Amino acid sequence: MNLPLLEVWKCWTTPEDIVHWNNASDDWHTPWAENNLQPGGKFTYRMEAKDGSFGFDFWGIYDKVIPYEKIEYTLGDGRKGSVLFSADDHSTLVVESFEAEETNPIELQRNGWQAILDNFKKYALK
């Protein structure tokens, strides 16, 4: 995306920003987020259907944090994930990888995570 790395990192890691982009569809939202961005630190995002019919805490523990470069984490169910940031003078690339869970089809999971990334980009570019 056409934003400097520092701005992208802030939008990705700041709870006040996370609540604006962390949803996979328009009928869901994140009413609050907590983020202790350091190895051993915990993140929790409260994800809820806007109609109040369902909600859950999406959480994990940071395994490795290299500021402005890499975040590795373990989700509450033990799956691993990572986010890589790379930049040149005018743009920043964000790549998120995750271990799929076994309940839902991989394509459905990929589409959900991609929708969140798309919402992140839309929010960050405002």
PLM-predicted stretches and their roles:
Residues 123-126:
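Short, highly charged C-terminal tails/helix-capping segments
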Residues 1-28:
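Hydrophobic ligand-binding cavity/cleft-lining segments
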Residues 29-72:
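Glycine-rich portal/gate segments that line the openings of hydrophobic small-molecule binding cavities
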